[in-house]
């Protein structure tokens, strides 16, 4: 019963305070006409596909972007034997935005620290999951930036 009351109260508060989702269709005021990649990596392809999802074909703000991304995995901590115990994965996305009125370059990055795992297969699966999460964060940042242009 308490949960129902809290949910109803929260919905009234959020509706009355002017809350709007970040990615509502009216906020996407850009159309990506062309996405070119400096290198043809899987990382660039994933980012390009995610960016296309947020493109609004009805927008008057038509842009072309050139993307270049880099993924780094660094050892941040070692155990007593000298084996890595903690890593940091960082993804950096450089975007060159081209419009008839301007040419801007912006960089977005996101990183995550994680522990080593003795099961290398499980570690690789976890790294893929981390990579996808970091890509989503970077795409969110870039969509917000592109919406503000």
Language-model features, listed with the residues they occupy:
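Positively charged n-region of N-terminal signal peptides that target proteins for export
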Residues: 1-4
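Surface-exposed short loop/turn segments
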Residues: 48-49, 53-54, 59, 66-107, ...
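A positional/architectural concept
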Residues: 29-54, 58-59
């Amino acid at each position: 019963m308490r949960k129902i009351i809290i949910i109803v109260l929260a919905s009234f508060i959020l509706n009355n305070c002017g809350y709007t989702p970040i990615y509502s269709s009216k906020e996407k005021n850009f159309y990506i006409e062309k996405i070119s990649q400096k290198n043809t990596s899987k990382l660039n392809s994933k980012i390009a596909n995610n960016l296309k999802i947020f493109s609004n074909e009805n927008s008057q703000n038509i842009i072309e972007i050139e993307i270049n991304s880099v993924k780094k995995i660094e050892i941040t901590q070692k155990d007593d034997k000298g084996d890595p115990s903690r890593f940091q994965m960082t993804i950096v996305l450089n975007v060159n935005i081209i419009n008839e009125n301007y040419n801007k370059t912006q960089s977005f990055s996101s990183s995550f620290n994680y522990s080593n795992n003795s099961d290398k297969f499980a570690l690789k699966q976890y790294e893929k999951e981390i990579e996808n999460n970091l890509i989503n964060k970077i795409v969110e940042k870039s969509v917000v930036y592109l919406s503000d242009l």
